[in-house]
Amino acid sequence: MIVAVLADVHANLPALEAVHADFSAEGVQSVWSLGDTVGYGAEPFACLQMLADLDAVFIAGNHEQAACDLAEANGFNSAAAHAIRWTRDKLSTDTRTNLCELPVNFSPQPGVFLFHGLPGNATGYLRTEETGQMVFDHLTDRDPRIRVAFFGHTHRPMIFTHLTGRPVRMFEPLEELILAPGRRYLVNPGSVGQPRNGDPNAHYLIYDSEEGRIKFRKVPYDIGTAQERILQAGLSPSLAARLSQGI
């Protein structure tokens, strides 16, 4: 199966539309969304609806959790907290209910696992080799057949790899990764809607489960339109400004 794996869309419809156009030309058969479809951006419902129309697999990110329960936003900065309150007000009761029912983890096929921040914890961060080792240990206990897990939350493309008896290694991806026999992987596709790796393009990946191949994609989109919509919605200008910088 060929899958588009997306994370951290953050209500950025122009970015999501550009990514959709890109993966539509790549023979993608399914879409997996790793959470935080909402928050920060100005078009949460349109992004949720677009992914639903694609029959995407959804899991919850911390922004979905905050849209369900504002107490979950206690650790947000002022711009993020204002955006999630605005998002909550804009979404229908039915849509919020659907968000509240999303799982925090999911296995879409044997040997594959999805989570947002850390397994069972959408607010945790996976960004060190030490944390990577803990996640690999957790996944071994959960299901030793898991070969690759996809996660988001950091807004940065990243790969962790582990071979039994060897230390975990973390590295930034190139354009393509071939999954090596015997190795396990934790893979972050980067953010569609608010990259933080210094590259403002929309990031995602394409996973070919039969070939064991991952292609990392960076897609230009109309950043100016996304910024204009954020400002028109009355959200923080900082959320608009950062899009052009990829921070």
Outline where the language-model segments fall.
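Anionic-ligand binding region
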Residues: Q133-L177, G182-Y185
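N-terminal active-site segment of His-dependent metallophosphoesterases
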Residues: M1-A56
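Beta-strand-turn-beta hairpins that frame and shape the catalytic cleft
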Residues: M1-A4, S107-F113, A180-L186
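Active-site environment of divalent metal-dependent phosphoester hydrolases
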Residues: H10-A15, G39-G41, Q65-C68, S107, ...
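Active-site neighborhood of divalent metal-dependent phosphoester bond hydrolases
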Residues: C47-R145
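Active-site neighborhood of phospho(di)ester-bond hydrolases with catalytic His/Asp-centered motifs
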Residues: L6-A7, V31-D36, V57-N62, F115, ...
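Acidic, His/Gly-rich catalytic cores of divalent-metal-dependent hydrolytic chemistry
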Residues: T164-I247
